[in-house]
Amino acid sequence: MSITLALSKGRIFEETLPLLKAAGIEVTEDPETSRKLILPTNRPDVRVVLVRATDVPTYVQHGGADLGVVGLDVLLEHGGQGLYQPLDLRIAKCRMSVAVRADFDYAAAVKQGSRIRVATKYVSVARDHFADKGVHVDLIKLYGSMELAPLTGLADAIVDLVSTGSTLKANHLLEVERIMDISSRLVVNQAALKLKREAIRPLIDAFAAAIPQE
């Protein structure tokens, strides 16, 4: 009974490796040097598939993978339908925030009820956040380089992930509101959990025992 785990390259992949090791699983090829999108492990019954971060929930939901590791930001935007979400893995931590140009008075715009143009790739999350606060916004969907939007006049504000804040600072942007803290979650295909329970449940338990403590 084989198990397929969906991961994205980069920080999530690197920070998932110690959790896999705790479960007795080691990826035997480096994704940065290998051209393969399906990576073998030291266990013949476990393989890792490399997909875009935004595609991880879709692969797991539709059975392309049995499990996956995905950021809460992606999961919320996806909606999480058809996914069992047993664990907050507490890795790849950052925050989702609102940021503006240094010369834009965000608080005044909100107070006056002005319509604010906001660029983001997290349209669903941003829409819910501003609706809850009663802030009038026009949302502009972008896929990258969010910091450019206020600098070019495309938007008044952005909603994006922030780790250290250095990128915002380098582009003369100010973080004015924290929407939520973000970390990565383990997601499991619900059908796979039933059909492959004897193989999947020990993995979940091993991950749980290896989660970094606060």
UniProtKB/Swiss-Prot annotation:
Heteromultimer composed of HisG and HisZ subunits. It is found in: Cytoplasm. Belongs to the ATP phosphoribosyltransferase family. Short subfamily. Its EC number is 2.4.2.17. It catalyses: 1-(5-phospho-beta-D-ribosyl)-ATP + diphosphate = 5-phospho-alpha-D-ribose 1-diphosphate + ATP. This is ATP phosphoribosyltransferase. GO terms for cellular component: cytoplasm. Lacks the C-terminal regulatory region which is replaced by HisZ. The keyword Ligase does not apply. Pathway: Amino-acid biosynthesis; L-histidine biosynthesis; L-histidine from 5-phospho-alpha-D-ribose 1-diphosphate: step 1/9. The gene is hisG. One of its GO terms (molecular function) is ATP phosphoribosyltransferase activity. GO terms for biological process: L-histidine biosynthetic process.
